[in-house]
């Protein structure tokens, strides 16, 4: 197997296959669940709006892939600084049956100099999650500056985040290798690689993209760090490219170019 094919297979099994569109329907989510099951293995998870969790759970069970995890989003996509709303949404997501919650960090508050609200929001959302994985989206493409990206990452980790995630996919600039490196370096420098994972999201569209991100993680955190507990790709259109690279002809619906 070529290096690119090996990376493609690795990336496929780390995907949070995503549809987060205003026009999502039960039918689109059912199709997404079908896409998560491929001839070369399953994606790690699907990522959907909370209201679709019951239909997704049913579909995944019926198609024989109950191990595909269901991630959902809260405080999404704007990252407002109302802690009570973020916590209420997170509790509701857990009640719906989410396996993982991707919450948006109040990044604008941090840009305005408020570090406390982000810490408290993440801390309380993690308490609401219990054992359920909490991924925190810091919106790197809006923070832009290395100091802010690293500070947001540190706050999230100190507050109990299980993952730090680049982006919502809803702003002009999403994951970039530059931003990914900053966040991976924080995980390394804080000595939390055993407990904290990383998720680039938005803009990872090809096997070559994914291979470069994985090589960076191997370089910074070691060859044995990347696994589904420590690394995910938030993407939709990536799956078709990975399957093409692997020369597998699955008929994949493309919910967006996320």
From Swiss-Prot:
It is found in: Cytoplasm. InterPro entries: Aldolase_TIM, DeoC, DeoC/FbaB/LacD_aldolase, DeoC_typeII. Its EC number is 4.1.2.4. The active site is at residues 102, 165, 199. Pathway: Carbohydrate degradation; 2-deoxy-D-ribose 1-phosphate degradation; D-glyceraldehyde 3-phosphate and acetaldehyde from 2-deoxy-alpha-D-ribose 1-phosphate: step 2/2. Keywords: Cytoplasm, Lyase, Schiff base. The keyword Protein biosynthesis does not apply. One of its GO terms (biological process) is 2-deoxyribose 1-phosphate catabolic process. The keyword Oxidoreductase does not apply. GO terms for molecular function: deoxyribose-phosphate aldolase activity. GO terms for cellular component: cytoplasm. Signal peptide: none annotated. It is an enzyme of class 4 (lyase). It catalyses: 2-deoxy-D-ribose 5-phosphate = D-glyceraldehyde 3-phosphate + acetaldehyde. PANTHER family: DEOXYRIBOSE-PHOSPHATE ALDOLASE. Belongs to the DeoC/FbaB aldolase family. DeoC type 2 subfamily. Catalyzes a reversible aldol reaction between acetaldehyde and D-glyceraldehyde 3-phosphate to generate 2-deoxy-D-ribose 5-phosphate. This is Deoxyribose-phosphate aldolase. The lineage of its organism: Bacteria, Pseudomonadati, Pseudomonadota, Gammaproteobacteria, Vibrionales. The gene is deoC.
């Amino acid at each position: 197997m070529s290096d690119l094919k090996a990376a493609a297979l690795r990336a496929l099994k780390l995907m949070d296959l995503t549809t987060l569109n205003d026009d999502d329907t039960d039918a689109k989510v059912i199709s997404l669940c079908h896409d998560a099951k491929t001839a070369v293995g399953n994606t790690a998870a699907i990522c959907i709006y909370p209201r679709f969790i019951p239909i997704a759970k049913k579909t995944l069970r019926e198609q024989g892939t109950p191990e595909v995890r269901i991630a959902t989003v809260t405080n999404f996509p704007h990252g407002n600084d109302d802690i009570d709303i973020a916590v209420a949404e997170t509790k509701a997501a857990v009640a719906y049956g989410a396996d993982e919650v991707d919450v948006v960090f109040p990044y604008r508050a941090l840009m305005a100099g408020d570090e406390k609200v982000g810490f408290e929001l993440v801390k309380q959302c993690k308490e609401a999650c219990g054992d359920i994985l909490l991924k925190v989206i810091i919106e790197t493409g809006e923070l832009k500056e290395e100091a802010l990206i690293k500070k947001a990452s540190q706050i999230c980790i100190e507050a109990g985040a299980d993952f730090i995630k680049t982006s919502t996919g809803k702003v002009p600039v999403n994951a970039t290798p530059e931003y990914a490196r900053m966040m991976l370096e924080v995980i390394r420098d804080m000595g939390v690689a055993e407990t904290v994972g990383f998720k680039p999201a938005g803009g990872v569209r090809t096997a070559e993209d994914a291979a470069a991100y994985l090589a960076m993680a191997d370089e910074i955190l070691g060859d044995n760090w990347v696994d589904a507990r420590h690394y995910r790709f938030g993407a939709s259109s990536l799956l078709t490219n990975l399957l093409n690279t692997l020369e597998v002809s699955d008929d994949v619906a493309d919910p967006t170019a996320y």
